[in-house]
Amino acid sequence: MAAARACIVALALVAALFVAGSAAAAAGNAGGRPQLSLRQRRRQLLRQRQVRSHLKRLNKAPLATIESPDGDIIDCVHISNQPALDHPFLKNHTVQMRPAYHPEGLYDDESKVASQRNAQTITQMWHQNGRCPEGTIPIRRTKEEDVLRASSVRRYGKKKRRSAPNPMSVDPDMLNESGHQHAIAYVEGDKYYGAKATINVWQPKIEQANEFSLSQLWILGGSFGQDLNSIEAGWQVSPDLYGDNNTRLFTYWTSDAYQATGCYNLLCSGFIQINNQIAMGASIFPTSSYSGSQYDISILIWKDPKEGNWWMQFGKDYVLGYWPSFLFSYLADSASMVEWGGEVVNSQADGVHTSTQMGSGHFPEEGFGRASYFKGVQVVDSSNNLGAPRGGLGTFTEQSSCYDVQSGSNADWGTYFYYGGPGRSSSCQ
């Protein structure tokens, strides 16, 4: 009898545990949330640890912090504590605070640009709430949600492969398979030591969060296979990278065709910033409006003939910093091609072309105030002279019915081109 009574008690206990477990499972599934398996929970915890470790490497201790009206947090980090100096080859690097040489003819060109009528002032949004002190650089703080939007921690802040357009390609359809489309002007066939342009600034509409639209210049060396070297700068709208649709200043570099090396802005060791006024990846404003005010930014990238580093200047006042020459193989000497223009990601959701806009979202033939442009397009030659490309510009686009480009030259703008388009339309499916 005692044994039977013990058996009944044991069965009751098992039943109670089963009911409690079922109730807990039901509570866990409230709202339709599926229960994670032990393996899934471990994977989730591992990713969280990886993200937090990555954030710790990227977000250096600031001496001051500025909250931007657009939600960004700008950390003012001591110049000697910036992410670039984490690179093993830069552990004992003495930061070069100014280039040994600027290109010849630069200031003649800027005097001409400054005297043009209807010049509009453009700035960064965080400036409304303060500036970083001397001896620091402004760094846009990376948030946990920024990293979580990436396909992996390792790929955060990196472009997809085959992102640089190859105008020599005989098979545009093959380029379309990469999901990237372009409308560019270019020069090739010589040695180039820099490039400059004034870029019209817009806020193009993005259809899918995993797409982007940018306008930039590319300094290129090597082949379009596994060893491409590229230095890039311009403006972009990229919800996946930044979490919003703001127009932002950006830089990029790679020494292996976007495979393992390089990144946007200061999201890895590479670009050494010296300027305390301009933040890479921060919003720029105002932007141009259709048939309204037009706003431009000017970008110059050149190779210092003495030190060999590649420098970047924003506008006529801000020398931002440099990419050390050791980061590159081909670009350690010179560039073999320079490109300027627009790029979008076409994810082809539902099997149709994206409606993500390039430039202003309007075709080149609409002209000033409606179509986006690059003007004052120049290159730096082997004598460190800045001037118009000899022989003019080549142009390239994969699908001119979606995004197009038209180049020209005149006394006011020098070498220029209009570019862009709406993406999906009656003529672009």
Language-model features: locations:
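Exposed, interaction-prone regions of secreted/extracellular proteins
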Residues: 2-429
